[in-house]
Amino acid sequence: MENNTSISGTIINVQHFCVDDGPGIRTTVFLKGCPLRCAWCHNPESQSKAHEYMFRQYKCTDCGICASVCKNGVHSFENGIHNVNREHCKLCGKCTLTCCVDALEISGKEITVCEIMDEVLADRVFYKRSGGVTISGGEPLFQSEFTFALLSACKDKGIHTCIETCGYGKAEDIKRIAELCDIFLFDYKLTDSALHKKYTGVNNELILENLKLICTMGANVILRCPMIPDVNMNENHYNAIAELANKYQSIREIHLEPYHPIGIGKAVSLGRTCDYDRSEFLERSELDDVCSYIADKVSVEVKVI
């Protein structure tokens, strides 16, 4: 298979030994950049493709070393408070290298497919019985050429592949990627299109069209459904999830994902606010009834992850 491993993309990181991003033990590549702006996003640093400055104030010990190495006046200390002037930041990263408590970070780095494959192949021993590579985000379709090249490189080595996608992208990109993807972890967030736009920034028509496309191509799909209190936890949405599973034989499983508030702290570290600011975790046990409700209506496995 022809493949260009010199293609580069923008990622957040590569995580190893992941167990919730597809079957088996997986190496998950988190790309940067997403066309959606989900109000509850737990990885807000993945929304913009640009490199971004993150300051975790709760970790800062006020040592002041960052201010001494920064030549742009980003850091200042007054009355025991560490102030960060993001407008002055040039993203040089010097301060992050001096911070020994991980309070400072530049989110985003450029990397080639070849460099990622070096990490993937180092993990290959764990893929012998199950597992593989998952491309997540952000949104893999947002960097479609890079995603295609990485999938091609994995298939050249016989490695199982998944992508986690919101489904918002060009049909031609999805068709190419589907030929190389063993499993789509396809997000289904909201049934009502107007509410979908309110909470994610886009309507859901294109997403549903692309779900239909990959299902008619015979792709293997796991429908992943974030459960967000006061947003989509209602019988209308549960019934729609079941209807999709019954409509498309390509949908092999349904995964319910309980809300967690980790994204709130990340948004603060980026200098933003979070539109959905529920601070309590949704416990897995709180979804037992939802899981049973949907399972009674479908023939595929439904589980909370």
Where are these regions (language model features)?
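N-terminal pre-triad scaffold of radical SAM enzymes
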Residues: 12-65, 82-91
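Iron-sulfur cluster-binding cysteine motifs and their immediate structural context
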Residues: 39-46, 65-84, 94-110
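Short loop/turn motifs at secondary-structure junctions
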Residues: 37, 71, 95, 100, ...
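Auxiliary Fe-S-binding modules of radical SAM enzymes
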Residues: 1-23, 229-305
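Extended, non-globular alpha-helical segments
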Residues: 55-61, 108-123
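Anion (oxyanion) recognition and catalysis
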Residues: 91, 155, 215, 295-296
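Conserved AdoMet/S-adenosylmethionine-binding subsite of the radical SAM
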Residues: 114-269
